């Protein structure tokens, strides 16, 4: 027997508790109430699920910033690269990545300073914004709060989103945000058909394109899917759609021009696709298809499995006879199918044989929403399944919290160890024999030095306009790792600089009891000997 003590507030979540009688536990009932609150109720004027997500992101910004400040640690690989490049606004930054994430980092740093706080605001602002846009789009299409919550928390079932994007990755997180914003903008076009809606759709299209270049797959798939449905085709053929096209082109034009004039920088990472590594055309195609299937399973396998198990757990619940899905659901399924087809064609036509799991993000970002919409038509069985998805997504997000805090302080192995270096000590040793305005290294770990001196110029071998960016006095700083140094030596020479004959080795402390306790760094002053040679500007 169970007795309820206290109440349940729809504004502030579960406030009562259950009293144990006859030795029976009530944890399950309490968790079900909490899940229902996340799905259907409000926290003040906001949906409870949205409030949970926003609070989660705020907590992450505060805890990660304060813990790093307390420990004196730096940032990991991807965010140290942002520290290096976000010093200036530019149409492009190299590394085969579009500039939008860096623009946001630059803007935030101009408001709160070049700091860990700035980068965490960008990261978790994008995560919260993307999840909120995703939720809102599903609701605007007429589906239930429960479906919208299941779609939003369903995104957190992807390990690449709930885990990898919290301790690494930058531009992939921009895909989550701006693909969701584009989804919402399309919904607004279909609902309102106003000039403002079409203009915002153009801006959202540009933002999605400038988040990461492989997001063109999502753009193309969503466009073709909209053309394939009678209910959405009319909005695309509306002459006001030209407003969207013009706005998108104008917003992307500076980066498009930069890309065409910096093709070498744009394609600098193209060897990562493993093009034509199979030898013959048939072998290459086989490797490509196998790699694609493996990437699909690694990326989407877990969320699909969780949705399937959640559905099986609700199998005893009643459900009406199956009916064809409404047009919004058809739109999403078709977008996913077209994205898969486009990806397969690119693999076969381009001879791609190597994949990273996160490259599947533009293909499957609409999958949780499509599944949540399907469940909305399944009565009590669908409601139960949606609740399970919300519960699992929320629990996974909370379980990740302490691990993400650990990674923020300790980093990983190999390159990730740069987090634990004492950059204040390194900066003091760099400037012990005179001021330094530019630090050059073979890769972007040295971007962390801008946490100590925001005015410092930090360059690596992939920075465009390398020669023009150097401000004297300049030093070359090389770490005791296995990174090749020949490229940076070549760029220094072409920029008209020579290395001093004196190479100073300094021991940089590693924090938090790391072993070995220090890392060896070689510091060499650079001297101007000639003007930059042809080709040194890029």
Language model: regions and residue ranges:
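Aromatic/acidic, Gly/Pro-rich catalytic loop(s) in extracytoplasmic/lumenal soluble domains
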Residues: 6, 467-538
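Short acidic/glycine- and proline-prone juxtamembrane loop motifs at membrane-interface regions
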Residues: 164-174
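Transmembrane-helix motifs of polytopic, lipid-linked glycan transferases
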Residues: 121-142, 157, 162, 180-185
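Short helix- or helix-capping micro-motifs
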Residues: 57, 151-160, 205, 209
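Membrane-interface transmembrane helices that cradle and orient dolichyl/undecaprenyl
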Residues: 182-200, 375
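Membrane-proximal, lumen/periplasm-facing interface regions of secretory-pathway glyco-
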Residues: 350-357, 379-434, 442-458, 480, ...
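Hydrophobic/aromatic-rich transmembrane helices and adjacent perimembrane loops
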Residues: 326, 330, 334, 351-386
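Transmembrane-lumen/periplasm boundary regions of multi-pass, lipid-linked membrane glycan transferases
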Residues: 219-328
């Amino acid at each position: 027997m169970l007795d309820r003590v206290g109440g349940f507030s729809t504004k502030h979540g579960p406030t009562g508790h259950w009293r144990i009688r006859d030795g029976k536990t009530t944890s399950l009932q309490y968790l079900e109430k909490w899940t229902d609150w996340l799905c259907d109720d409000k926290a003040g004027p906001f949906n409870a699920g949205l409030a949970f997500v926003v609070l989660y992101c705020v907590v992450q910004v505060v805890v990660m910033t304060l813990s790093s400040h307390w420990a004196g640690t730096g940032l990991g690989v991807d965010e140290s690269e942002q520290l290096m490049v976000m010093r200036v606004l530019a149409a492009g930054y190299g590394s085969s990545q579009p500039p939008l994430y860096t623009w946001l980092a630059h803007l935030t740093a101009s408001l709160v300073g070049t700091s860990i706080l700035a980068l965490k605001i960008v990261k978790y602002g994008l995560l919260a914004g993307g999840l909120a846009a995703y939720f809102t789009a599903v609701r605007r299409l007429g589906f239930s709060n429960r479906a919208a919550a299941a779609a939003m928390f369903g995104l957190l079932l992807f390990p690449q989103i709930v885990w990898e994007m919290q301790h690494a990755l930058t531009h992939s997180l921009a895909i989550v945000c701006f693909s969701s914003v584009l989804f919402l903008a399309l919904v607004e076009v279909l609902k309102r058909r106003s000039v403002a809606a079409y203009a915002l759709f153009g801006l959202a299209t540009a933002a999605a394109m400038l988040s990461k270049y492989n997001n063109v797959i999502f753009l193309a798939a969503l466009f073709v899917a909209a053309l394939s449905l009678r209910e959405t085709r009319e909005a695309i053929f509306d002459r006001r759609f030209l407003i969207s096209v013009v706005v998108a082109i104008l917003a992307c034009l500076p980066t498009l021009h930069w890309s065409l004039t910096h093709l070498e920088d744009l394609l600098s990472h193209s060897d990562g696709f493993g093009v034509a590594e199979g030898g013959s055309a048939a072998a290459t195609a086989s490797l490509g298809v196998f790699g694609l299937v493996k990437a699909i399973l690694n990326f989407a396998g877990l969320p699909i499995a969780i949705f399937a198990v959640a559905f099986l757990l609700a199998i005893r619940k009643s459900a009406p006879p199956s009916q064809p899905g409404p047009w919004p659901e058809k739109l999403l399924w078709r977008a996913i199918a077209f994205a898969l087809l486009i990806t397969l064609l690119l693999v076969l036509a381009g001879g791609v044989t190597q994949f990273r799991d996160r490259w599947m993000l533009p293909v499957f970002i609409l999958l949780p929403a499509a599944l949540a919409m399907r469940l909305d038509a399944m009565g009590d069985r669908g409601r139960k399944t949606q609740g399970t998805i919300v519960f699992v997504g929320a629990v996974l997000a909370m379980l990740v919290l302490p691990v993400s805090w650990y990674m923020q302080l300790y980093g990983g192995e190999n390159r990730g160890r740069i987090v634990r270096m004492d950059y204040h000590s390194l900066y003091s040793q760099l400037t012990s024999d005179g001021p330094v305005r530019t630090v050059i290294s073979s890769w972007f770990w040295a971007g962390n030095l801008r946490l100590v001196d925001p005015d410092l110029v930090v360059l690596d071998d992939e920075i465009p306009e390398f020669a023009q960016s150097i401000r004297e006095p300049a030093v070359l700083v090389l770490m005791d790792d296995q990174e090749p140094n020949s490229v940076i030596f070549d760029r220094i020479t072409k920029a008209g600089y020579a290395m001093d004959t004196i190479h100073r080795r300094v021991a940089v402390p590693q924090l938090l009891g790391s072993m070995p306790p220090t890392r060896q760094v070689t510091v060499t002053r650079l001297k101007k000997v000639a003007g930059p040679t042809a080709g040194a500007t890029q």
